[in-house]
Amino acid sequence: MDTVLTIGSHSSLQILHGAKKEGFKTVQITPKNRVNFYSQFSFIDEILGYNNEDEAVEFVNKYSNRGALIPHGSLVEYVGSERVSKITTKIFGNRNLFAWESNQKKKMSLLRRSGIQVPEEFENVEDVDRLVIVKLPGAKGGKGYFIAKTKSEVKEGLNRLISSKLIKDVNDVIIQEYVIGVPMYFQFFYSPILNRLEITGIDIRYETNVDGLRRLPENLADPTFVVVGNIPAVARESLLPKVYDYGMSFVNTVKEVVPPGMIGPFCLESVVKDDGSIVVFEFSGRIVAGTNLYIAGSPYSWLYWDEPMSVGRRISREIRLALNSNKLEVIFT
């Protein structure tokens, strides 16, 4: 195995930059209209431009004998689970988690089973009695999410989602208590080779107009939650033991419920309340775009490796460690 490939979006530059640092050949599989952009980066050895997602899968499968595909949010959301099931090339991480990540209710059940504090959910619109956020399935980067104060506002919002064809059925969404606090997205890497959980970074998502509404008169604009960027963050050190415990609990639950378990990067998307408690409202079971902040390494990854270590490079370091110990089967599915 000598080649690392990924889909041209999300965190692909970081992934391939890290792979080249670890001595692998790199392949970018991207929509044709992005080929010119990616061609300027010397660490990308080969670029394959596709016309549609079916062709993307064909390109991926060209490397079934010597390559590893690194998944990210665009693979989960846009290539789709049905096409992913046709991929014969090795995938780094647990591909069985994709189905869980695309279903909000299943995602939350994993968090609850891990003993992690989560927001209250409302199965029935009629039970809504506080500020809530309504979320759509999949890795859509916040598209279509909305806040509601009353059950009538929830119903109106659901009707808009159906009419705009963002959802097919009201049961597709999750209605969740809107937790007030500081958002912090805790990034982790679980290494089956080293049997170690690493805290690799923290970010805050920068969302379209919701971050500007505080400067506008009330009711002048409706908030939207489409993620357009990320802001770096560090947490008080006294919070980190709890963050680590949450991460390990989640790793243990995934190992039990979604074999072969957690492999590589994941993120617990959280709110830290004023009493110091941490409420986790979502997880991502693969590399998140917030790690792009730390291509030169994060304040936390330096503590583990004492060298520049992005999550993209950390993935390829894990592959290298597995190659050296003849344990590739432990990290690929």
From Swiss-Prot:
PROSITE patterns, A to Z: ATP_GRASP
Annotated TM spans: none
Key words of the record: ATP-binding, Ligase, Magnesium, Manganese, Metal-binding, Nucleotide-binding, Purine biosynthesis
E.C. designation(s): 6.3.4.23
Cofactor binding remark: Binds 1 Mg(2+) or Mn(2+) ion per subunit.
Swiss-Prot/TrEMBL GO biological process terms: 'de novo' IMP biosynthetic process
Amino-acid positions noted as binding 5-amino-1-(5-phospho-beta-D-ribosyl)imidazole-4-carboxamide in the UniProt annotation, renumbered to this chain: 10, 74, 230
Location of the ATP-grasp domain: 95-324
Chemical reaction(s) catalysed: 5-amino-1-(5-phospho-beta-D-ribosyl)imidazole-4-carboxamide + formate + ATP = 5-formamido-1-(5-phospho-D-ribosyl)imidazole-4-carboxamide + ADP + phosphate
One GO molecular-function entry: ligase activity, forming carbon-nitrogen bonds
Cofactors named for this entry: Mg(2+); Mn(2+)
Binding-site residues, Mg(2+): 269, 282
Domain of life, per lineage: Archaea
Family listed: Belongs to the phosphohexose mutase family.
Function summary: Catalyzes the ATP- and formate-dependent formylation of 5-aminoimidazole-4-carboxamide-1-beta-d-ribofuranosyl 5'-monophosphate (AICAR) to 5-formaminoimidazole-4-carboxamide-1-beta-d-ribofuranosyl 5'-monophosphate (FAICAR) in the absence of folates.
The protein's name: 5-formaminoimidazole-4-carboxamide-1-(beta)-D-ribofuranosyl 5'-monophosphate synthetase
